[in-house]
């Protein structure tokens, strides 16, 4: 079954320093029919104002994938680790119990725009805490998978995530790993 949902139908937030669109129930936005999709719990588009930060917080055991669309971000954890990611990069953070994480827009002049996905992590799998790759700008790129194949980020879940960039009138086709549950955004 194919369900179509426009950006205007998504949950929205505007806190001044943060503007967001929520595909699934998140924060103050709640729709009992939209609690996630299989292991995908969060799919947000967020714009952080220049210099804005998310304060440190803990997460459930999830893999957080950030696709940086514009700007540059810094991610820190309570263990002293930090990493930066800029436009055109994908950053995967494998959250751990008891560790807090914070996020910052490094620019004092430009906004930071990103897509953020949270995927439930399999409890018995452990991966590197932070992984990063370049989004190549190819028509189609595998960006995350359970085994890190084709230079992709390695997830703690049986999920394959592709980045597909099409110009008006272009088409693409590729073989799906799991025909039972596929999502296109």
Named regions from a protein language model:
Residues 95-125:
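Ligand-binding loop in jelly-roll beta-barrel domains
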Residues 182-185:
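Conserved small/polar residues in nucleotide/adenosyl-binding loops
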Residues 113-148, 152:
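A contiguous pocket-lining binding segment that forms or flanks enzyme active sites
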Residues 4-14, 21-31, 41-59, 69-76, ...:
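Conserved short histidine dyad/triad with adjacent acidic residue
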Residues 102-104, 125-133, 152-156, 173-176:
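A short secondary-structure junction signal
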């Amino acid at each position: 079954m194919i369900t179509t949902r426009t950006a205007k139908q998504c949950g929205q937030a505007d806190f001044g320093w943060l503007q967001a669109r929520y595909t699934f129930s998140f924060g103050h936005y709640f729709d009992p029919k939209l609690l996630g999709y299989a292991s995908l719990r969060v799919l947000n588009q967020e714009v952080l104002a220049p210099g804005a930060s998310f304060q440190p917080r803990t997460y459930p055991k999830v893999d957080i994938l950030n696709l940086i669309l514009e700007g540059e971000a810094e991610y820190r954890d309570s263990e002293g680790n930090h990493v930066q990611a800029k436009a055109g990069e994908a950053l995967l953070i494998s959250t751990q119990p008891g560790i807090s994480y914070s996020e910052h827009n490094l620019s004092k002049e430009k906004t930071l725009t990103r897509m953020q996905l949270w995927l439930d992590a399999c409890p018995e799998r452990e991966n590197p805490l932070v992984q990063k790759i370049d989004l190549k700008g190819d028509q189609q790129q595998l960006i995350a998978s359970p085994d890190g194949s084709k230079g992709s980020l390695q997830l703690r879940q049986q999920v394959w995530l592709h980045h597909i960039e099409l110009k008006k009138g272009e088409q693409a086709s590729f073989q799906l790993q799991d025909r039972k549950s596929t999502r296109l955004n």
